[in-house]
């Protein structure tokens, strides 16, 4: 069976090819219908309004080549940035995250804790509530993001 990339996958790949060096596409998603939202990060500088406007002008032609002519929104991933790739989990070892998995692990789907270790197939999370460790495979993660304690 031949698996074809989804429209969002194709658009994401076009964006990644067009982005300047040192800029990362953290997440792409359709928001509010035809609005394509791109969360981007970059090395050595802020993701401010000027940078986002520049990214739109860079990626718009690449998206048009893929047949997308809708609206584009570019923004920073924020302080509770999504973790969408294994490399993100590696980068944030030692940081607190919130993770949702598709199939229950140890009878639950939602976890909050600190990333302890990362392997090729998954990662180990030290749970906030009891300090226990749970191993979660990357393939089971449906949503994950940094969890900042804003009360400190």
Curated annotation (Swiss-Prot):
Subcellular location per the Swiss-Prot or TrEMBL entry: Cytoplasm
Gene source species: Rubrobacter xylanophilus (strain DSM 9941 / JCM 11954 / NBRC 16129 / PRD-1)
GO cellular component, one term: cytosol
Superkingdom in the source lineage: Bacteria
The entry's keywords: Cytoplasm, Ribosome biogenesis
Name listed for the protein in its UniProt record: Ribosome maturation factor RimP
GO BP annotation list: ribosomal small subunit assembly; translation
Function noted in UniProt: Required for maturation of 30S ribosomal subunits.
Homology family: Belongs to the RimP family.
């Amino acid at each position: 069976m031949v698996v074809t990339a989804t429209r969002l996958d194709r658009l994401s790949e076009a964006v990644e090819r067009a982005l300047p060096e040192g800029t990362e596409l953290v997440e792409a998603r359709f928001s509010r219908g035809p609005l394509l939202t791109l969360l981007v990060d970059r090395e050595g500088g802020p993701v401010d309004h000027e940078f986002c406007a520049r990214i739109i002008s860079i990626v718009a032609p690449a998206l048009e080549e893929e047949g997308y002519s809708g609206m584009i929104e570019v923004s920073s991933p924020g302080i509770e940035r999504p973790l969408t790739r294994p490399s993100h989990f590696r980068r944030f070892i030692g940081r607190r995250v919130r993770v949702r998995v598709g199939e229950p692990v140890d009878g639950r789907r939602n976890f909050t804790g600190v990333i302890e270790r990362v392997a090729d197939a998954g990662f180990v999370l030290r749970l906030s509530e009891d300090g226990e460790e749970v191993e979660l495979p990357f393939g089971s993660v449906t949503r994950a993001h940094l969890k900042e304690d804003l009360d400190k």
